A protein has these predicted regions:
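Conserved SAM/SAH-binding loop
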Residues: 12-16, 34
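Class I S-adenosyl-L-methionine
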Residues: 87-122
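Flexible, glycine-/basic-rich loop-and-beta segments that form/coincide
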Residues: 113, 118-141
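Single conserved hydrophobic/aromatic residue that forms the stacking wall/gate
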Residues: 1-6, 10-11
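A short acidic, Gly/Pro-enriched loop at the edge of an enzyme's catalytic core
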Residues: 17-27
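A short SAM/SAH-binding and catalytic strip from SAM-dependent methyltransferases
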Residues: 26-39
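Short, glycine-/aromatic-enriched active-site segment of Class I SAM-dependent methyltransferases
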Residues: 59-76
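A short glycine-rich, Lys/Arg-flanked "PGG" loop and its adjoining helix->strand segment in the class I
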Residues: 38-54
Length: 141
């Protein structure tokens, strides 16, 4: 078991390739800031065909500026639902499938609701109750 930490790394300035790793990773955990995970997932999906991915979905970086409120907070549940449905549809275009989807048990730094998505290349026909996941969001204290 080996863990490589990429905190403080600007993924926009880095080209990620399977050749960079020996052995090739089979798992990635993503918690990125100030960037949509849509900019990172295609590289992971292409370069690491057997990789499982757990990604933190942050609606404030996925919804688009027009749907993000004051101070970068997304409060509208409809926007959360749109973001999650859109993300579920998007990952399929990359050959990835959502195997688990849930609300994060902690809020983002500024109080944003965030969600955890477990992705694999293994096909599944799971359907997630996105509306319920959003509406029943609770934070553990």
């Amino acid at each position: 078991l080996r863990c490589l930490v990429g905190s403080e790394m600007c993924i926009r300035d880095s080209y990620l390739s399977g050749d960079m790793f020996d052995p090739r990773p089979d798992f990635a955990c993503m918690d990125v800031s100030f960037i949509s995970i849509r900019q990172i997932l295609p590289v992971l999906a292409e370069q690491f065909a057997d990789m499982e991915i757990v990604a933190l979905v942050k609606p404030q970086f996925e919804a688009g500026r027009a749907k993000v409120g004051k101070h970068g907070i997304v409060k509208n549940e409809k926007v959360h639902i749109e973001v999650l449905q859109s993300m579920c549809d998007y990952v399929k275009t990359l050959g990835l499938y959502v195997h688990h989807l849930c609300a994060s048990s902690v809020l983002g730094r500024d109080g944003n609701k965030e969600f955890v998505m477990h992705l694999k290349h293994t096909q599944t026909h799971k359907v997630f109750p996105i509306r319920d996941i959003v509406k029943n969001y609770t934070v553990k204290r």
